[in-house]
Amino acid sequence: MNASLSDFTILEADAAELQQQLTHGNVTAREMAALTLAKIERDNPTLHAFTHVFADQALASATDSDLRRSRDALRGPLDGVPLAVKANLAVAGWPQHAGLAFRREAVVSDDAFVIGKLRAAGAVLLGLTNMDAGALGATGRNAAFGDVTNPRAPGVTTGGSSAGSAAALAAKLTTLAIGTDTIGSVRIPAAYCGIAALKPTSGAISTRGVIATHQRFDHVGPMARSMRDLATLFKVLVGWDRQCRVSFPLTFQPLRPATTPSRVGFVTGFDTLEPDSATLDGYNRAIAALR
């Protein structure tokens, strides 16, 4: 790795920045994977963000990415980029436990549809992330695998149920992550952990290979530390899966500058709620900043 590029700096990079460093030869995909795995080993015993880590597979995948780069045969913007996967998605050879104690040994033989897309894109899969049991919760607490710690505010909930994915991103234990969302499970932890996430249009991303909470309302959601990474990851994940009953063909529309000024709506009265003064002050300051 380039001596001018510190470990901390490269771990802070989003996927777009990491690709620039990889292209310029300042770091290799294997070096990035090794640094990320070392940080997971150091910090995860406290954070409980990951339940399983694919160390050997991740290093092998990163090495393959470096080889493709040397042959000018990259598979796209995710090639060589570390990525964490919520544990209710099927990853071949690993338990699809969904945060449930009785599924600790439920090793699956096939990948979820989106995992296949991520492998084809060259992403480096790091491991399975912790979650509220059965995706039925919004706190990140889990009796079987440990409560997920919020890296930005230890002692404060991470939100959930995609708690481990959000915490891993906030703690720089991964560059990208996958979560799922039925009634807020990527949006809530993203807000609580200070990262970005997207609940996509229903059917835009296949849910085949995801343990269902409610088939009609379940979504696979990209999670990242920047909006541009969300767009990049969404573009890879989106696509019709003829074996998924809720999937439909969708043409990805790239981000483009707005042609008219943005408008933001906000609530001025909380007749049925009593937010504390600090929360209300932060809310009002955010409104003022957006004006």
Predicted feature locations:
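An N-terminal boundary/leader segment
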Residues: 1-57, 291
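Acyltransferase
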Residues: 29-33, 63, 277-291
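Conserved hydrophobic/aromatic pocket- or pore-lining residues that grip, position, or stack substrates
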Residues: 36, 58, 86, 118, ...
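Long amphipathic alpha-helix in the N-terminal Rossmann-like dinucleotide-binding domain
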Residues: 56-63, 122-123, 132
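Immediate post-signal peptide segment of exported/extracytoplasmic ligand-binding proteins
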Residues: 65-82, 229, 256-265
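Enzymes and membrane/adaptor proteins characterized by extended Gly/Ser/Thr/Asp/Glu-rich
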Residues: 77-114
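Short glycine/serine-rich loop segments
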Residues: 110-237
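A short helix-breaking turn/cap at a secondary-structure junction
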Residues: 199-281, 285-286
